[in-house]
Amino acid sequence: MSDKPLTNLNFSSLDLHPALLTGLTRAGFTLCTPIQALTLPVALAGRDIAGQAQTGTGKTLAFLVVVVNRLLSRPGLVNRNPEDPRALILAPTRELAIQIYNDAVKFGGNLGLRFALIYGGVDYDKQREMLRKGADVVIATPGRLIDYLKQHEVVSLRVCEICVLDEADRMFDLGFIKDIRFILRRLPERCSRQTLLFSATLSHRVLELAYEYMNEPEKLVAETETVTTTRVRQRIYFPAEEEKIPLLLGLLSRSEGMRTMVFVNTKVFVEGVARALDEAGYRVGVLSGDVPQRKRETLLNRFQKGQLEILVATDVAARGLHIDGVNYVYNYDLPFDAEDYVHRIGRTARLGADGDAISFACERYAMSLPDIEAYIEQKIPVAAVTAELLAPLSRPERASNGNGDTVGDISPHSLDVLVAQEWRRGKPRGSPGERDGRPRVGKGPRSDGGGGRRRTKFRLETERDSSVDGAVTPVFGVSTGIVSAPGKEVGRNLGRRRRSRSMDSGESGHVVATTAQVAVKSGSQPSLLGRIGHRIRSLLNMF
C-alpha cells in the first residue's frame, strides 16, 4: 500500500474508531485513494456495495477498514462460540489471501482482533486447530473453507456480521462460483449482515450474484480499465515464433536491473521460457499452478526483495498479486481474454505510478489483438522487430559418437519413439549392415505370400540356438518392450502357436522377423506332423 495523495480525503475525516485511526497512521496511511474515497463513506454507514476497481488501487485497505471498524465499534454476541467468526473475507487465490492477511495484521494486529488465514496446500490440522481456538476475522479461499464448514465443530458462519468477496470476477473464471454460493447460503440472512463485493469488472454475471445475495447493493465504479491502461506505456511486436526468445532476451538486455514479469499462456511454455532466461544469466522464478504452495511463497518473497530479477507466470498463478515496483510486464503470449490483458499489465503502474507493457503477437495468438484493443478503447503502438533487437542464441554442444563425428543430443526415449513410429509405418530406421558391432541381415519377404494373418507392429530379432538344433530364439527388440526366454515365442496377438522349423544350416547371424514370421516355416526340414504324414504314406505304399 502507499499513502500517495491521489485524493484530498483524509482518513481522519471519516467516522473511524480511534484505535483504528491510530493504527492506520502508524502504518503510514493518511490520504485515501479514489476507490477508498468512493466506498468508505457508503460502507462505513452499513450499506452493501458492489465496487469496481483494478488491483493496486487500494481496494484491499478499503474493505479492511470497513471490517475492522465494524468489529471495534459493535460488540459481538455474548453467547458466540469460539468457532463462530464475526467477519469473513473470501479471495480466489492463495497468494491474494496471504496478501490480504498481511495487510490486515499490519495495521489491525494490535487492536485485539484475531485473524485466521485459511487456504489449501499447507498443514490441514494446524489450520483446523486455529479455527477451533477462535478467530474474529477469517480470510480464506473457498475450497479449504468448505472442507472445514462440512465439519460442523470446526467453523460456523451463523453469526457472521460482514462478508467480503474480493476479485469476484476471478471467482467465476476459476470455477468457484458454486463454492461461493455454498458459502453464502450458510451466512445469516442478507438483511442481517453487510456484504462488500469488489471486482475488476462488474459484468452481468457478477452483478447477478450481487443482487441475489446482497441487500440492495450500491454500484460504485472508481475508474474504468481505460483510465488504468493510460498510465502504462504499451507497445507490441509481431515476431515469428522462433524470434520470440531472441526478441525477449534482446529487450531485457536494454532494461537490466528492472523488476520484470513475463506472462505465458500455458504451463508447458512457462518452463521453456524460464529455462532460456536462466541460461542467459538471469535470476528467474517460475509461478504456475504446478508449483507447491510453500515454494510459491518463497518465490514471491524473493522476487519482492529483489533476489529474483524476472518472474515468469501464468494468468491463474499471478492474478491478484500485490507486488510493488514492477517496472516491466511482458506478454510473451497475447492472452485469449481481453480482461486478462488488463489484469496482466495492471501488475505495473500501480497506485498512479508509470510502467511499461510489451506484448508479442505471434501467428498463434495475434487473433486476440482486435478484441484487446476494442476492450481498452485504444490502439496499441506497433514496434518493428529489427536485427539489433534479436539476441543471438548459443548453439548447444554436440556430442561425439566415437568415430570423430558429432551427433545431435537425442534422448533415448525420443529415439525409441522415433524407431517405433518408423516400424509402424513399415520403414525400418537405417539400412542393413553393421549395427552395434553386429552384422544385420535385411528383412526378407513374407513366406505366407502376403495373405493369412495380419502382421503385428512389433518386431523380434531371432538367432539360431547352437545347442538345440532347429530352435528359434526370439530376442528383445527395440519396439517390443518384452524380453523373451530362449526357445519360446513372445509377442502380442500371436494367435495359435506353431512349432517352427529349424533354420537352414547355411544361415548364420541374426534375422529380423515379425512375430508372425517366427511362427511359420523357417527352413527346408519338414515339421513333425509333416514327417508323421510322410511316414504313414510310406507304410501304406508298402502294402
From Swiss-Prot:
A motif (Q motif) lies at residues 9-37. PROSITE patterns: DEAD_ATP_HELICASE (PS00039), HELICASE_ATP_BIND_1 (PS51192), HELICASE_CTER (PS51194), Q_MOTIF (PS51195). It catalyses: ATP + H2O = ADP + phosphate + H(+). The keyword Ubl conjugation does not apply. SMART domains: DEXDc, HELICc. Its EC number is 3.6.4.13. A motif (DEAD box) lies at residues 166-169. It is found in: Cytoplasm. One of its GO terms (cellular component) is cytosol. Residues 231-391 form the Helicase C-terminal domain. Keywords: ATP-binding, Cytoplasm, Helicase, Hydrolase, Nucleotide-binding, RNA-binding. SUPFAM superfamilies: P-loop containing nucleoside triphosphate hydrolases. It is an enzyme of class 3 (hydrolase). Residues 40-220 form the Helicase ATP-binding domain. ATP binds at A53, Q54, T55, G56, T57, G58, K59, T60. DEAD-box RNA helicase involved in RNA degradation. Has RNA-dependent ATPase activity and unwinds double-stranded RNA. Belongs to the DEAD box helicase family. RhlB subfamily. Component of the RNA degradosome, which is a multiprotein complex involved in RNA processing and mRNA degradation. HAMAP family: DEAD_helicase_RhlB. This is ATP-dependent RNA helicase RhlB. It comes from Xylella fastidiosa (strain 9a5c). The gene is rhlB.
